[in-house]
């Protein structure tokens, strides 16, 4: 089973995914940007405060995603793992969409990668997310409260349109993780039918 956990920066994705991975058998956790060459370029660029046209960001994230899927996700799925990725296509839709890139374009450039079996949105108020991010030390280019409000709205709109479960991530991570595990277990049971 292939699962994407999405949400604005500061929504607790990393912490929740770590808890979920402990609760389920044979879980492989990965994230975007990936550890591949394009993903490393994206991380380095962000850390240096680099800015590019949002269309360039969208293309680079899509390129990283294709490489990530082929190099890492697909082989682990074939080996029988539950693969959980922190961020996937919906992150590009939300972030680059909030920066003005048409969603249809983002969907098109990402059409070569398979959709996850399950996408879960962790939802938190952007002001709370910024507090959490500041506790980590530095803000990155996508981390300003007004921008995160736009990103959050796109996530919630997409969740309604696509039927993605939305979890209140303003609660303690352990509670959020329990909800995520329950959703995954239900989805796995329905896939077995």
Curated annotation (Swiss-Prot):
Q: What class of enzyme is it?
A: transferase
GO CC annotation terms, alphabetical: cytoplasm
What InterPro entries does UniProt report for this protein, alphabetically? P-loop_NTPase (IPR027417), Thymidylate_kin-like_dom (IPR039430), Thymidylate_kin_CS (IPR018095), Thymidylate_kinase (IPR018094)
What protein name does the entry list? Probable thymidylate kinase
Enzyme Commission numbers on file: 2.7.4.9
Q: Which Pfam families match?
A: Thymidylate_kin
Which SUPFAM superfamilies does its entry note? P-loop containing nucleoside triphosphate hydrolases
Q: Which CDD domains match?
A: TMPK (cd01672)
User: Organism classification, top ranks?
Assistant: Archaea, Thermoproteota, Thermoprotei, Thermoproteales, Thermoproteaceae
Record-stated family:
Belongs to the thymidylate kinase family.
The protein's annotated catalytic reaction(s) are: dTMP + ATP = dTDP + ADP
Q: What keywords would UniProt list here?
A: ATP-binding, Kinase, Nucleotide biosynthesis, Nucleotide-binding, Transferase
Molecular function GO terms recorded: ATP binding; dTMP kinase activity
Q: Which gene encodes it?
A: tmk
Q: Which residues bind ATP?
A: 7-14
Question: One biological process GO term for this chain?
Answer: dUDP biosynthetic process
């Amino acid at each position: 089973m292939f699962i994407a956990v999405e949400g604005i920066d500061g929504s607790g994705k990393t912490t929740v995914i770590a808890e979920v991975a402990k609760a389920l058998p044979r879980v492989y956790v990965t994230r975007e940007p990936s550890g591949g060459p394009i993903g490393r370029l994206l991380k380095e660029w962000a850390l240096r405060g680099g800015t590019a046209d949002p269309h360039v960001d969208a293309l680079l994230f899509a390129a990283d995603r294709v490489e990530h899927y082929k190099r890492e996700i697909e082989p682990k799925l074939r080996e029988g793992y539950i693969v959980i990725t922190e961020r996937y296509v919906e992150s590009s839709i939300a972030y680059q969409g909030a920066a003005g890139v048409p969603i249809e374009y983002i969907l098109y450039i990402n059409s070569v990668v398979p959709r996850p079996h399950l996408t879960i949105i962790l939802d938190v108020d952007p002001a709370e997310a910024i507090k959490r991010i500041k506790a980590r030390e530095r803000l990155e280019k996508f981390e300003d409260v007004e921008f995160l409000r736009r990103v959050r709205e796109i996530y919630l709109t997409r969740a309604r349109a696509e039927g993605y479960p939305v979890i209140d991530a303003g609660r303690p991570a352990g509670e959020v993780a329990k909800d995520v595990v329950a959703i995954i277990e239900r989805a796995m049971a329905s896939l077995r039918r």
